[in-house]
Amino acid sequence: MIQRLQNLYLTKVQTTLTEQFQYKNTHEIPRLEKIVINRGVGSASQNTKLLESLADELTILAGQRPIVKRAKKAIAGFGVREDMPIGLTVTLRGERMYAFYDRLVNLALPRIRDFQGISPKNFDGHGNYTLGLTEQLMFPEVSYEQIDQVCGMDISIVTTASTDREGHGLLKELGMPFKAGSVN
């Protein structure tokens, strides 16, 4: 089943971007490649039940099970030992990626209190965008009673765009609510 945003990309966004950036080849047109969701576990690294709860939450949000990232070496200043769980990561591609992006843009971001739009300055220089969220409660799949710990996440949207302007144009056409302002 083709996702709504994927269909929008194929029918409208490709032609709009071709006109805007004067592409000569259809393979030059930027597209979404993947969405990577990272979440640090903090104190949950000591508590396996809490770690499982955070992993289950991320599974509900992303539609697939996260990978537990472990410390490669001990850092005494942070109280981290080698092989201790320090984060959760999910990489979304294809239909799951478009479904998550659709829910993020149309359901989750508008539920943020006093939401004015997101900053257009978080591009990395190669057309990829990273967004930090402070809590998971903005997603309709997560209810306040379900969660054990309020915890944010970083969402990286990786595109095939070669410049920030192209990446901004792609995400804007796909419905990302940017604040007024210029890209780096």
UniProtKB/Swiss-Prot annotation:
GO BP of this protein: translation
Organism domain of life: Eukaryota
GO molecular function: rRNA binding; structural constituent of ribosome
Protein's organism: Ostreococcus tauri
Family label: Belongs to the universal ribosomal protein uL5 family.
Xref: InterPro entries: Ribosomal_uL5, Ribosomal_uL5_bac-type, Ribosomal_uL5_C, Ribosomal_uL5_dom_sf, Ribosomal_uL5_N
Subunit structure: Part of the 50S ribosomal subunit; contacts the 5S rRNA.
Protein name stated in the entry: Large ribosomal subunit protein uL5c
One GO location term (cellular component): chloroplast
Keyword DNA damage: no
Lineage, uppermost ranks: Eukaryota, Viridiplantae, Chlorophyta, Mamiellophyceae, Mamiellales
Described purpose of this protein according to its UniProt entry: Binds 5S rRNA, forms part of the central protuberance of the 50S subunit.
Subcellular location: Plastid, Chloroplast
